[in-house]
């Protein structure tokens, strides 16, 4: 129980960065040469001490060819079912909690419009604060109903705040990575 509580808090604790953890999301299609080339240009700027996780054959090939520290590679089908993404996220969270790397970042191609896709790297962990995380969720899914927000009754959380925080942060990271995978496949 306290271990879960600690893992929830670990997602918010900033620690000295010895190793960045970078998830690289590439396309598998051969006709997207510039898309992957631009993404790999951004990945190439990441310092050599970083540890990488790849989603997509092209990312795996690139990271192997450039002799980067590739911890794992995953394949996510075109439909990107959440069950496939869950394996990736659970691996990343485990590596982060075991302190094999001190950040979780995602290198992906951001879809601007059909003619413009921008490669970028976003940091997911550690979280800056809970308010930022909630604001992101509200922006994506809408704010809670005002009547619910005004309810001042005290709520007893079971199993406990620590477990809920750990689950909430884990779900948030899963949802964010899932969204980035969908966006990079657009």
Task: Provide a role label for each language-model segment.
Residues 1-186:
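C-terminal beta-strand-loop-alpha-helix "lid" module of Rossmann-like NAD(P)-dependent dehydrogenases
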């Amino acid at each position: 129980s306290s271990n879960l509580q600690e893992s929830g808090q670990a997602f918010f604790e900033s620690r000295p960065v010895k190793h960045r953890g970078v998830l690289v999301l590439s396309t598998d299609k051969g006709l997207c040469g510039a898309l992957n080339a631009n993404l790999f240009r951004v990945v190439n700027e990441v310092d050599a001490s970083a540890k990488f996780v790849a989603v997509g054959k092209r990312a795996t090939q690139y990271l192997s060819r450039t002799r980067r520290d590739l911890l794992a590679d995953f394949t996510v089908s075109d439909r990107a079912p959440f069950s496939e993404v869950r394996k990736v996220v659970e691996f990343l969270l485990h590596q982060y909690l075991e302190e094999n790397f001190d950040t979780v970042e995602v290198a992906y191609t951001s879809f601007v419009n059909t003619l413009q896709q921008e490669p970028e790297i976003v940091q997911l962990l550690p979280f800056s604060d809970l308010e930022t995380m909630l604001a992101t969720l509200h922006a994506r899914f809408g704010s809670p109903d005002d009547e619910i927000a005004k309810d001042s009754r005290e709520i007893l959380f079971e199993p406990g705040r620590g477990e809920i925080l750990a689950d909430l942060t884990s779900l948030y990271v899963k949802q964010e990575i899932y969204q980035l995978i969908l966006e990079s496949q657009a």
